[in-house]
Amino acid sequence: MRMQHQDKDDSLQSRVSEQIYKLQSQYLAGVPSARGALAELRKAVDEEPGINPHVWFMTMEAVPERWTGTSDKPNYSELAAFTALTLYAVHQRGKNTPMHVPGIPFAKATGQLVRQRTASMKRRFDAVLTATTFDAQRYHLRSLVGLLSTDGIGFDYGRFANDLVHLQRTDSRPGIQREWGRQFYQSYAFTPKNESK
């Protein structure tokens, strides 16, 4: 299956986007196997990556071969793909519209969510950025994704996976924190002309 990706962009972002787009298209078309796969991914959201062999297989299909781990622990790319896939499954549950929306950053979607609700919800977003472990970040991300699902606000899961790799790395984490902060602020603070009265 990896051979078909040789002529395409083989980045984590494109591979996660491709896999989620396929799942999303099949789910929205009512394909039973896609519903089953999303249910399995949802069940795995709080599990350690690799515990469920089918979910781990789906995760590994989304990780470019050159970025697969070699130790007994998942690496940054594997954790990012696993997190993106399982959170997407939570996000899409019960929705008949796409929750994977290419081009919409996670932080922009979250800014829109907070703008539609209450400013005090920004603390949930801040908790993701200030959490000291990836497990804590995953916990706070799940909370936000649940709220985004409730409000029907989607975002780009391929880009999200790429951002999650950088959020785990101490050398690139400050850059992602700044980028997400800017995206959040721009979405939260600036109302597009078509929304003004």
Language-model-detected regions and their locations in the chain:
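Aromatic- and glycine-enriched beta-alpha-beta binding-site module
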Residues: 64-112
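Non-catalytic, well-ordered alpha-helical scaffold segments
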Residues: 35, 39, 53, 57, ...
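N-terminal domain-start signal
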Residues: 3-68, 83
